[in-house]
C-alpha cells in the first residue's frame, strides 16, 4: 500500500481533474495499522509496552481504550510518541486499580478512525495444587503412576523429586509428562520412596505433598492377565499451536502393545506427532486438522485380546477472514452493502464498527448475518467501516471506506409531513412538495418503522410524483410508528423530511391466553394464565372471561375478571371428576376468540398421601421444540417416585406417558409442528398412587418458512450412514445439503430403539458437525436414526430413517466344560461348551496349548476354530510330556477371558503299548495342575467284571439253544418264527412279531437258526450233513455259490414285485443277525428262473475315526466327533464262505416289515456286497442294522 507522502501530489492532481464536476469527492489515503497490540502476561511491578503504530494521511491521533472505555493517562501509564502504550509498573490489585483487561488503540485522521485488535493483559499467577500425588503400592515389575495438577498463568513447568532429590529421567522406563503425570514402568525395589512434584513459573515455585511408593515382591507365577488401560486419554481442548499430550497406560500379562488411531480412520500426522514413554501420544504445534477422536488400543501380542479407550481433541482457532469488505463510492440516497465472512473455532461473532464505534441496526442501517446494508445514504455515512470477528481465542478486524458523492442540484426535503390514524392497521400520511427544485422530482419514497424497541426493520414504499399522500395499511394494532419522506430526482435524492410518529388504534385480541390448571385439594381447580404477547394482544386487555363445566354436563358457567388478574380458584367442585375450562380476553374494542376447552381431573377424595401438583412452566425454544420445567411444592411431604408427562396437540391424540425420574425438573419436547397449540399435563406419582396433575397450554411460534410461505424449508440431510462402533455406540455420518452456503448449520439427531413404547427413551442430540458418535446404547439392540438440520431459523424435515444394530458384548466368561481326550499316541481331542449366558455371541474360539517346558518359556501354540465348533484336535504331541490347555471365546468386539488350565499327560510309548487301546484319558475342568489322566484300579475292576458277566450270559444262551434243539429233534417239524433276539438284529417290530404269532399256530417263541424248517412242499436239511434242498418237485440241485456284487434296489420297486402271500422261505447265512436270505415263491422255482437280489444295509465294526480338527463338533457323551461322518462312514460287506445251513419260515407280512425297517437311505448311499448265492434259488438278501 503506498504511503501518503509518496502519492499525495499525484493523486490530488489526477482526482482533481477527473472529479472536477463532482465537488465533495476527496483523495482518501488509507488508514491502517503497522503494528497492533498483542496479549501480554506480566508479573506485578513489571514494565509493559503495548505496541500500536498507524499509517495514513497526517495528522493521526492515537488513543487507547481499556475494556471499551478510554484509558486515563498519568505518570505510570501514558502513550509514547509512536502510539504505543507504556505502563511503568503493572498493578494487580482488585478493582479499578488493577491493570488487567482488554486494551485497544484507536487511530484517527480527518477521513475516519480505525480500531485495533484486542490485547489481553494478565498477571502471572499460580494457585494451590488442585490434584496431589497419592501413595500407592505396586508389585515388582508393575506400573506406578503419580499425578498432580495446578493452575498457573503462564502454565507451570512440572518436575518430580524422589526422597527430596531431583528424579533422574534418563531411564527409558520413567516418563514425566508435561501435564504433571509421572509413569514408572517395570517397577524395581530401588524405586520405592517418597515422590512429590514441583511446579515452577516465572514468579514462584510450589511443591506438592509427598506420596509413598511401596514395592511388593513379585510372585513366581505370572498368570495370564487380560489387558487393562489404567490411565486412558482424557478429552482435551487446546488452542492453535499448543502441544497436547494424550496419556495411555496399560497393564497385562504378557505386556500389552499400545497403538493409536483416529476414529474417523484418517491418518495421524506423523510430522507433528511422536510417542512419549510406553504409549503416550504427543502432538506438537496443534492445528485444526488434528481435531478428532483418538483411540488408544492395548493388545496382547499374538492374540486378538485387546481393550480400547477414546478421547476427543478439540482445537480452538482464532478468527480469520474468508471474505473482506471492499471500499465503496455511492451517491446520496443510494444503498451500500458490505460483505464479511470469518471462520474460527468456536464460530466467531461478527460485529460492525463505524469510525471505531459499534453500529446498531436502525431503520436505514441493517445487519443481516455478517452483511452490513446502509439504505438512503446521507453525508454522515461517509466514514471508515470495520468488520470485527471475535471469539474466545481473539479478535480480527478488516476495514473499508464508504465515500458519499454529493450533488448541488438535489431538491430540498418534503415538508409539513403529518399522519392521521385511519384504523387499527392503517395510517394516512401526507406532505408538501419540496420548496427547491420540486419540478425535478420524479418520485417519493415513504419510509416507516416501529417507534418502540431496538433493531426494528424499516419498510420503504416508492410512489409517483403526482401525489402527496399515501395510506399505509399493513400496520399492527395499538403500535407507534415513525415516518419520513425522501424526494428523488435523476441526479440524486433530497434529504430526509422531518420524522413524524403516529399510533394505530386497538383491535380485539388475536389470541387467547395460555392457561394452566392445577388442584390444591380434591374440590378445587386453580386457573392461572400468562399475559398475551403484545404482538397478539392488539391493545390493552381490560377483561377476562372464564368458562367451565363438567365434561358430562352441557351447562356452562361463566365468570368475568378484570384485565389485571392472572389467576382464579374454582372451589366447591366434585372430586375425581373431569372439568373443561376455557378463557377469552377483551380490549376496549371487544372480545377476542376463546381458547379451546382444556380438561383437568380433580383428585380423588381419598388421595391423602398423593403428591401435590407441581408448578409447571412451558417455554417454546423454537418453532418445533418446547421446554417443560416444573418445581415441586417444598411443603409437600408425600414421597415422589417419579413424574409422568403427557402432551398433545389440540384436537389430536395424547402422547405419553413419558416416565421421568424424581430428580428431573426439566424435559424438552421435540418434533412438534409450528404455529400449533399444545396441551401439556404433568403429575407426580409414588408406589401408592398418582398425584395431583398440572395442566398447561402453550403455542409453538411460526417458522420462517411457515410464516412467509416464500422461503421453502431446507431439504433434510442426505446419505445418512450408520456403523456400529462398539456394543454401546454407533457412528453416524450424513451429507450436508448443497442448498445453502451458510456457515452455521446445526443438526438434531433422533435415536431410539426399534419398537419403543416409552417416549421418554427417545434421544435427541445436537451437533454442528456432519457426523456423531452416539454412545450409551444397549448391546445387540436395533436402533433407528433420523437427522434434521436447522439454519437461519429454518428446520428441515426428518431424513429417511436408518436402522442399525449395536455389536454384541465381548464374551464375559470363558468356555465351560473343557475336556481333553487322548485318542492317539500323539493326538488329543479337546472339547468344550460355549460360555454361559443366552446373549453371548461367539464367532471364534482360541485354543492355547503348550507343554510344561514351553509354558515356562511363555511359548504357546495357538489354534483357532469357528464359533459353531466346540471340538478340536491337538496333533503332534510328544510322548512323556504334560500339556496345558486353555480356551477363550471371542467375537468381533473382543475376546473373553481364558478358561482354567486343563492338563493332559501323554504317556511314553512303552506304557501306552502295554495297555491295549482304546484307553481315553478324559480330563475335566479342573483348577489343580496335578490331576493326571489314567485308568485307576477301580475302573479296571469294573471293566473286568462287566466282561465276565457278558461272557457268562453268552454261554448260558448257547447252552439253552443246544438243549432246545435236541428237544425238538424228536418232534414233528413245524413252521417257526424268528426269535425276538433275531428280530432285534433285523429291526422287526414287536407288533409285526405278534401278528405272525396269531396267524401261525404253534410257532416256537425262541427258535434259532440251527432248527430245520418245513413249509408246504419244501424241506431244508439243516443238520449239518448236507445242504440239500427238497421242494414239491423233488430235490433241488445246488450249484456252486458264486460271489456277486449287488447294489441296493429301490424299496418301492421291491414292494411292487413282492408276491402277496402268507408264507415265504427264508434261508439265513451262517452269521446270525447279519444277513437274512429270504426265498420267495408261490410255486416251485424252475431251474431257469431268474433270481432277484436286494441288499438293504450293513454296518461295519465300530472303529475309531477322527475327522480333521477344523471340522470338529461335539458329539455328546462319547467324546468322538466327525464333521462329515455321513460321507466318511465305511461299511464292510458280509460274505459267507460256507453253504447255507439253515432255513426259517417267515411271514410275508413280517418280511415286508423287515424291508421297511431296515432299508434306509439306500437311494443316497448304494453299497456293494459279496454274497454266496445258489444259482437256482431266487433269494433276497436283507441286512439288518443293529442299533
Swiss-Prot record:
Pfam families xrefs: fn3, I-set, Ig_3
User: InterPro entries in the record, alphabetically?
Assistant: FN3_dom, FN3_sf, Ig-like_dom, Ig-like_dom_sf, Ig-like_fold, Ig_I-set, Ig_sub, Ig_sub2
Q: Which residues are glycosylated?
A: 82, 163, 235, 305, 465, 480, 622, 725, 746, 758
| Residue ranges, annotated region (Disordered) | 1103-1134, 1154-1187
Spans within the Cytoplasmic topological domain: 963-1187
Gene3D superfamilies (UniProt xref): Immunoglobulins
Query: Which ranges does the record mark as transmembrane?
Result: 942-962
SS bonds (residue pairs):
52-105, 148-197, 248-296, 340-387
Q: Where in the cell is it found?
A: Membrane
Q: Which gene encodes it?
A: PRTG
Task: Give the keywords, sorted.
Answer: Developmental protein, Disulfide bond, Glycoprotein, Immunoglobulin domain, Membrane, Repeat, Signal, Transmembrane, Transmembrane helix
Record's bilayer topology term: Single-pass membrane protein
Q: Which SUPFAM superfamilies match?
A: Fibronectin type III, Immunoglobulin
Q: Which residues form the signal peptide?
A: 1-27
In Swiss-Prot or TrEMBL terms, this protein is called Protogenin
An example Gene Ontology CC term for this record: membrane
Which residue intervals define the domain Fibronectin type-III in the entry?
413-507, 509-605, 610-709, 716-809, 814-909
Q: Where is the composition biased (Polar residues)?
A: 1173-1187
What job does the chain carry out? May play a role in anteroposterior axis elongation.
Member of which family? Answer: Belongs to the immunoglobulin superfamily. DCC family.
The UniProt record lists the keyword Disulfide bond:
yes
Annotated tissue distribution: In the embryo, expressed in early mesodermal cells, the neuroepithelial layer of the brain and the trunk neural tube, the neural layer of the retina and in the epithelial somite and dermomyotome. From mid-gastrulation to early somite stages, restricted to the posterior embryonic region but this posterior restriction is progressively lost during somitogenesis. As development proceeds, further restricted to the dorsal parts of the spinal cord and somites. In parallel, expression progresses caudally during axis elongation.
Organism of origin is: Gallus gallus
Name the residue ranges with Basic and acidic residues bias: 1103-1130
Amino acid at each position: 500500500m503506498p504511503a501518503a507522502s509518496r502519492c499525495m501530489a499525484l493523486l490530488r492532481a489526477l482526482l482533481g481533474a477527473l472529479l472536477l464536476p463532482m465537488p465533495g469527492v476527496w483523495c482518501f489515503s488509507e488508514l491502517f495499522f503497522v503494528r497492533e497490540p498483542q496479549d501480554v502476561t506480566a508479573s506485578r511491578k513489571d514494565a509493559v509496552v503495548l505496541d500500536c503504530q498507524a499509517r495514513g494521511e497526517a495528522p493521526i491521533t492515537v488513543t487507547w481504550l481499556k475494556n471499551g472505555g478510554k484509558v486515563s493517562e498519568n505518570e505510570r501509564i501514558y502513550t509514547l510518541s509512536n502510539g504505543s502504550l507504556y505502563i511503568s509498573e503493572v498493578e494487580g490489585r482488585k478493582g479499578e486499580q488493577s491493570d488487567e483487561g482488554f486494551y485497544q488503540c484507536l487511530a484517527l485522521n480527518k477521513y475516519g478512525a480505525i480500531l485495533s485488535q484486542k490485547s489481553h493483559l494478565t498477571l502471572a499467577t499460580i494457585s494451590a495444587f488442585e490434584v496431589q500425588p497419592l501413595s500407592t503400592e505396586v508389585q515388582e515389575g508393575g506400573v506406578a503412576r503419580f499425578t498432580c495438577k495446578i493452575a498457573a498463568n503462564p502454565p507451570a513447568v512440572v518436575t518430580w523429586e524422589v526422597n527430596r532429590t531431583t528424579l533422574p529421567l534418563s531411564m527409558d522406563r520413567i516418563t514425566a509428562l508435561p501435564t504433571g503425570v509421572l509413569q514408572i514402568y517395570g517397577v524395581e525395589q530401588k524405586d520405592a520412596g517418597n515422590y512429590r512434584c514441583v511446579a515452577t513459573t516465572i514468579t514462584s515455585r510450589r511443591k506438592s505433598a509427598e506420596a509413598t511408593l511401596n514395592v511388593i515382591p513379585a510372585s513366581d507365577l505370572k498368570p495370564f492377565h487380560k489387558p487393562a488401560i489404567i490411565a486412558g486419554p482424557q478429552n482435551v481442548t487446546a488452542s492453535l499451536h499448543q502441544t497436547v499430550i494424550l496419556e495411555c497406560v496399560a497393564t497385562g500379562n504378557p505386556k500389552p502393545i499400545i497403538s493409536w488411531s483416529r476414529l474417523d480412520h484418517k491418518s495421524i500426522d506423523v510430522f507433528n506427532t511422536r510417542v512419549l514413554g510406553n504409549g503416550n501420544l504427543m502432538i506438537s504445534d496443534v492445528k485444526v486438522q488434528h481435531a478428532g477422536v483418538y483411540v488408544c488400543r492395548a493388545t496382547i501380542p499374538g492374540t486378538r485380546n485387546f481393550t480400547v479407550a477414546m478421547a476427543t481433541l478439540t482445537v480452538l482457532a482464532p478468527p480469520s477472514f474468508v471474505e473482506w469488505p471492499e471500499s465503496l463510492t455511492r451517491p446520496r440516497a443510494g444503498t451500500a452493502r458490505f460483505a464479511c465472512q470469518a471462520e474460527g473455532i468456536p464460530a466467531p461473532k461478527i460485529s460492525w464498527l463505524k469510525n471505531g464505534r459499534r453500529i446498531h441496526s436502525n431503520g436505514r442501517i441493517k445487519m443481516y448475518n455478517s452483511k452490513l446494508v446502509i439504505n438512503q445514504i446521507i453525508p454522515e455515512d461517509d466514514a471508515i467501516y470495520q468488520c470485527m470477528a471475535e471469539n474466545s481465542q481473539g479478535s480480527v478486524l478488516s476495514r473499508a471506506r464508504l465515500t458519499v458523492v454529493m450533488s448541488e442540484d438535489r431538491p430540498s426535503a418534503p415538508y409539513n409531513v403529518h399522519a392521521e390514524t385511519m384504523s387499527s392497521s392503517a395510517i394516512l400520511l401526507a406532505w408538501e412538495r419540496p420548496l427547491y427544485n420540486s419540478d425535478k422530482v420524479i418520485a417519493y419514497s415513504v419510509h416507516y418503522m416501529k417507534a418502540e424497541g431496538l433493531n426494528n426493520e424499516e419498510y420503504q414504499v416508492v410512489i409517483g410524483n403526482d401525489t402527496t399522500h399515501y395510506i399505509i395499511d399493513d400496520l399492527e394494532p395499538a403500535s407507534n410508528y415513525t415516518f419520513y419522506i425522501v424526494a428523488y430526482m435523476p441526479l440524486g435524492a433530497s434529504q430526509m423530511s422531518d420524522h413524524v410518529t403516529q399510533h394505530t388504534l386497538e383491535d380485539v385480541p388475536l389470541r387467547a391466553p395460555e392457561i394452566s390448571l392445577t388442584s390444591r385439594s380434591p374440590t378445587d381447580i386453580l386457573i392461572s394464565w400468562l399475559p398475551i404477547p403484545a404482538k397478539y394482544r392488539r391493545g390493552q386487555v381490560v377483561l377476562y372471561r372464564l368458562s367451565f363445566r363438567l365434561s358430562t354436563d352441557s351447562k356452562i358457567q361463566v365468570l368475568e375478571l378484570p384485565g389485571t388478574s392472572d389467576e382464579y380458584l374454582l372451589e366447591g367442585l366434585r372430586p375425581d371428576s373431569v372439568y373443561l375450562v376455557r378463557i377469552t380476553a377483551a380490549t376496549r374494542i371487544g372480545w377476542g376468540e376463546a381458547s379451546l376447552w382444556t380438561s383437568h381431573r380433580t383428585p380423588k377424595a381419598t388421595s391423602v398421601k398423593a403428591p401435590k401438583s407441581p408448578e409447571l412452566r412451558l417455554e417454546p425454544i423454537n418453532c418445533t421444540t418446547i421446554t417443560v420445567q416444573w418445581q415441586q411444592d417444598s411443603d409437600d411431604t408425600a414421597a415422589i417416585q417419579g413424574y409422568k408427562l403427557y402432551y398433545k396437540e389440540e384436537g389430536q391424540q395424547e402422547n405419553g406417558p413419558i416416565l421421568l425420574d424424581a430428580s428431573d425438573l426439566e424435559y424438552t419436547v421435540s418434533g412438534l409442528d409450528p404455529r400449533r397449540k399444545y396441551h401439556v399435563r404433568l403429575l407426580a406419582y409414588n408406589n401408592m398412587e398418582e398425584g395431583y396433575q398440572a395442566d398447561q397450554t402453550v403455542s409453538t411460534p411460526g417458522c420462517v418458512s411457515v410464516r412467509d410461505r416464500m422461503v421453502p424449508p431446507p431439504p433434510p440431510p442426505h446419505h445418512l450412514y450408520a456403523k456400529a462402533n462398539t456394543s454401546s455406540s454407533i457412528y453416524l455420518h450424513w451429507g450436508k445439503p448443497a442448498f445453502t452456503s451458510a456457515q452455521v448449520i446445526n443438526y438434531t439427531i433422533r435415536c431410539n430403539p426399534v419398537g419403543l413404547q416409552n417416549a421418554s427413551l427417545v434421544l435427541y442430540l445436537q451437533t454442528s458437525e456432519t457426523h456423531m458418535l452416539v454412545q450409551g446404547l444397549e448391546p445387540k439392540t436395533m436402533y433407528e436414526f433420523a437427522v434434521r438440520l436447522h439454519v437461519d431459523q429454518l428446520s428441515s424435515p426428518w431424513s429417511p430413517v436408518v436402522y442399525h444394530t449395536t455389536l454384541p458384548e465381548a464374551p464375559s466368561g470363558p468356555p465351560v466344560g473343557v475336556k481333553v481326550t487322548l485318542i492317539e499316541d500323539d493326538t488329543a481331542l479337546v472339547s468344550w461348551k460355549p460360555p454361559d449366558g443366552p446373549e453371548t455371541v461367539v464367532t471364534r474360539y482360541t485354543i492355547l496349548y503348550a507343554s510344561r517346558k514351553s509354558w515356562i518359556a511363555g511359548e504357546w501354540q495357538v489354534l483357532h476354530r469357528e464359533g459353531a465348533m466346540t471340538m478340536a484336535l491337538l496333533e503332534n504331541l510328544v510322548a512323556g510330556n504334560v500339556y496345558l490347555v486353555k480356551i477363550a471365546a471371542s467375537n468381533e468386539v473382543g475376546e473373553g477371558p481364558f478358561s482354567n488350565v486343563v492338563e493332559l499327560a501323554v504317556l511314553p510309548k512303552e506304557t501306552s503299548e502295554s495297555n491295549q487301546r482304546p484307553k481315553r484319558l478324559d480330563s475335566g475342568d479342573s483348577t489343580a495342575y496335578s490331576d493326571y489322566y489314567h485308568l485307576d484300579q477301580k475302573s479296571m475292576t469294573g471293566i473286568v467284571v462287566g466282561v465276565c458277566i457278558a461272557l457268562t450270559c453268552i454261554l448260558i444262551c448257547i447252552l439253552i439253544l443246544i438243549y432246545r434243539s435236541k428237544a425238538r429233534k424228536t418232534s414233528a417239524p413245524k413252521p417257526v418264527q424268528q426269535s425276538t433276539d433275531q428280530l432285534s438284529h433285523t429291526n422287526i417290530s414287536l407288533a409285526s412279531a405278534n401278528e405272525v404269532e396269531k396267524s401261525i399256530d404253534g410257532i416256537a417263541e425262541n427258535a434259532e437258526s440251527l432248527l430245520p424248517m418245513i413249509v408246504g412242499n419244501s424241506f431244508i436239511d439243516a443238520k449239518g450233513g448236507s445242504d440239500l434242498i427238497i421242494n414239491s418237485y423233488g430235490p433241488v440241485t445246488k450249484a456252486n455259490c458264486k460271489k456277486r456284487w449287488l447294489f441296493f434296489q429301490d424299496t418301492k420297486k421291491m414292494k411292487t414285485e413282492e408276491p402277496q402271500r402268507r408264507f415265504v422261505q427264508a434261508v439265513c447265512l451262517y452269521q446270525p443277525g447279519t444277513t437274512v436270505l429270504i426265498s420267495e415263491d408261490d410255486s416251485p422255482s424252475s431251474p431257469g428262473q431268474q433270481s432277484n437280489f436286494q441288499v438293504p444295509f450293513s454296518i461295519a465294526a465300530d472303529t475309531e475315526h477322527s475327522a480333521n480338527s477344523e471340522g470338529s463338533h461335539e458329539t455328546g457323551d462319547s467324546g468322538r466327533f466327525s464333521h462329515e461322518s455321513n460321507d466318511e462312514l465305511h461299511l464292510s460287506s458280509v460274505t459267507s464262505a460256507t453253504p447255507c445251513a439253515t432255513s426259517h419260515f417267515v411271514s410275508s407280512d413280517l418280511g415286508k416289515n423287515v424291508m421297511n425297517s431296515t432299508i434306509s437311505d439306500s437311494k443316497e448311499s448304494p453299497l456293494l456286497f459279496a454274497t454266496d448265492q445258489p444259482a437256482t434259488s431266487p433269494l433276497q438278501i436283507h441286512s439288518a442294522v443293529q442299533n
